[in-house]
C-alpha cells in the first residue's frame, strides 16, 4: 500500500504554520545554530528544482540540530530589487512593485509546499522600506567615514536605449537587448572604497572554514601584488608618468612604454604627425568593454604617439605607444614594456617590430619571452644577481635616486555602487545648487522610492528617477537653497550584503538589529548557496561586515563561519536547465505527483551535495519506492500499526540500529547526505527480514528520517502514539558497545591459497582458530590424504595450514 502524500503533506504543513512550530525563541540556555540559505531573487519563472537542493541541505541540518538541543535560527527572505523586474515594467507598463509582490507570493507558496522549517515571522524583503531604511543607513555610515565617494568613471552608454548598461549586458560592443551600439563614456558615479579593506579581506580568509577553491577565487580577485612604482620623464617636455611593475629588476630591458588610450597625457604628448592615427584609435576603442580589451587571446593593436620617454635606469629613449589592453582604471594606466621577459609585451613588440633586449639569462628571447628566474645581464649594477636580490637592489636604487618607490597594488577595484535604474534603493544624498552635497538626515530615513506610472530611461544617462520632478527637486527649509536628490539607485548587491543580520532582529524599528541579539547569533554557522556567488556577493558581504565591525555594530570580524556550495542539477540530457532548452523541471509538478518528501529525499540522494548531476525521473521514482517501503513497514493494509512492532528494544536489529544512528548522525553533520540516506535504506532492508520490530528502534529510525522526509516522519510518529510534533524530540544516540561484532570473518588458507571463510568468535585465540579451521567441512575435504606440517593462526585475520 502506498501513502497519500497530498493529504499527509498538507496536514503537517498546516500544523506547523498554525502552531508556529519553527518560530525561533530567544533561549540562551541552549547552544545556538544559525543555518542560512542564499535568499533567492523572486523571478517570474518561480522556483526550479535547483533551488530546493541547497534549501533541503540547510533544512536537514536545522531539523537535526533542534533535536540535538540547539536553538536554531533558520530564516528565509527575498532579494527582490533588480533588473528583470524593471525590464518587465518597461516592457509592460506595470509597476515592478506589484510584479515583485506576485512573484514573492508564488515563491513563498512553492517553498512552503516543500516543508522547509523556516521561521516565517523573520521573513525579510529587500524592497520593503522598513528593510532598506537600514541599507540606506549603512550607506550613510560609509559616506561619513569617507568610504563612499563620487568619481568620474567610464561606463557603457547606449544612446539608443538612453541608459547605462552593466558589463554583462554588453556583447561585442552592442546591447544585449536590441543589439544597439554601445560606447564608453565618462560619468559621475558613486564608488565604495572596498580597497581600504583589501588586506583584511585577504588575511582573514585564513580563519574561515570555506572551500579552498572559493578562498583562492577571492585571493585572485583581490590580487595583491608587491613591486615598485617607477617614474618616467617624457623627453623634451616637463611631463612624467608612473608605471607599476612587479619586476623592477627588468627595468634595463624596458624598450617601450604603453599608455591607456584614456590616459590624461595622451593628448598632451602626441606629436602633430600622429594626432589623426591616435584619435582614430581612441574612437575605435570606445565601443569595447574592459573584458574585451584585456582578453589575452585577441590580436594586439596599438598606435605610436610620436613621443619618447626616458628609461630612468640607463637614460635611453623609448617610444610611447597607446594600446587598448592597458586600462586607465587599472594600476596607473601606464606600463613599461619588457618584451624579452613578458609574454604580452613580447607579442606586442613582435607585432610592431619593437626592440627586444634580454636582461635575464635563461631562454631564447627572440623566439619567446623568458619569464623565469636567472642571472641578470646587460643591467649594470644588477649584473650577476638573481631575481629576488635584483628586485630588492633596484627598489633601493629607485628610492635613493628619486626615480620610484616600493609599492603594493591590488587587482581589486573600488566598487562601482550606482545604477542608472529605477528599481533599487534610492541613495540618500542631496546635491545643492552651490555645488555641495549633504546626506539625508538619519531621522528622515527611509528615503522612499517614489511610485511612478511610467518607468522609462531619462535619456540623459541618469536613472528614470530624474523624470520625477516633484521627488527630485528639494528646497532647504532653513536657507531656501535649492537642490536635487541623487537619482542613481544602489545595485542589487546592496540589500544582500547584510540581510543575514536583519533576520536576527527583523522587526526592530530603532536599529539595524539589537547588539545583544547580534552577539547571541553571529557568526552564521552554516551558509549554503551556489558557487556563482563565490566572489562578488561574498566579498561585498565580508566588506560591509568588517565595516560594521569597525563602527561597533556587529561583534564579529567575519559573517560566515562555514560556507558550502551545492552543485548544479542539470537536465536529463546533462545540459544546464533553461527555458530555451525546454528541460526545466518544475517542483510543483513533482510535489503533486510524487510528494515533497520524495523530492527532498531524491535531491539529497542523487550524489555528493557539491557535485553537478543530471536529473533522473527513474531516480525520483526510486526515492518514492523507498518511502513507500518505509510506510508499509510501519502501517498495515488496513491502515493500522504493523503488529510486528513490539514494545522495548530487544536484540533484534540492535547492531544495525546503533550503526545507523552513528552513520546517519556523522554523515548528516558532514553534509554527506547521500551516504547517510544509504544507511537508512540498509536499516529498512534489515527490518524487513526481522520477525519482530522493537518499538524503540523503529521510533529512533523515524527520528533519523525526519530531517529528510519530515511529513512522512510526523505522520508515522503520530501513528506510533505521540501527540506532539517530532521536531523537538531528542535525536537518537548510539551505544559504542553495541557496534562491536560478536563474530568476525576470517579466511582459511591451504599452502597460502584461500580455501574457505569462517565466522568465528571475535575473541577466539590461536588454539580455537586452529580447531575451528581443521573441523570445517570444506577444509577437511581439501586435507584428505595430506599430512599437516604446520598451522599458522593469526587471531582476527586468518589460519594458514601447510600440508602435503
Swiss-Prot record:
Quote the InterPro entries the UniProt record gives. aa-tRNA-synth_I_CS, Leu-tRNA-ligase, Leu_tRNA-synth_edit, M/V/L/I-tRNA-synth_anticd-bd, Methionyl/Leucyl_tRNA_Synth, Rossmann-like_a/b/a_fold, tRNAsynth_Ia_anticodon-bd, Val/Leu/Ile-tRNA-synth_edit
GO biological process terms, semicolon-separated: leucyl-tRNA aminoacylation
MF terms (GO), sorted A to Z: aminoacyl-tRNA deacylase activity; ATP binding; leucine-tRNA ligase activity
Please give the SUPFAM superfamilies that the UniProt record associates with this protein.
Anticodon-binding domain of a subclass of class I aminoacyl-tRNA synthetases, Nucleotidylyl transferase, ValRS/IleRS/LeuRS editing domain
Q: Binding residues for ATP, per the UniProt record?
A: 579
Which reactions appear under catalytic activity for this entry?
tRNA(Leu) + L-leucine + ATP = L-leucyl-tRNA(Leu) + AMP + diphosphate
Return the motif ranges for 'KMSKS' region: 576-580
One GO CC term, this protein: cytosol
CDD domains associated with the record? Anticodon_Ia_Leu_BEm, LeuRS_core
Tell me which UniProt keywords the record has, alphabetically. Aminoacyl-tRNA synthetase, ATP-binding, Cytoplasm, Ligase, Nucleotide-binding, Protein biosynthesis
Q: Which domain of life is it from?
A: Bacteria
Q: Look up the EC number in the record and give it.
A: 6.1.1.4
**In the record, which residues are listed under signal peptide?**
none
Where is the motif named 'HIGH' region mapped on this chain? 40-51
Q: Which PANTHER family match?
A: LEUCINE--TRNA LIGASE, MITOCHONDRIAL, LEUCYL-TRNA SYNTHETASE
Family of this protein: Belongs to the class-I aminoacyl-tRNA synthetase family.
In terms of NCBIfam families, this protein maps to:
leuS_bact
Q: What is this protein called?
A: Leucine--tRNA ligase
Gene encoding this chain?
leuS
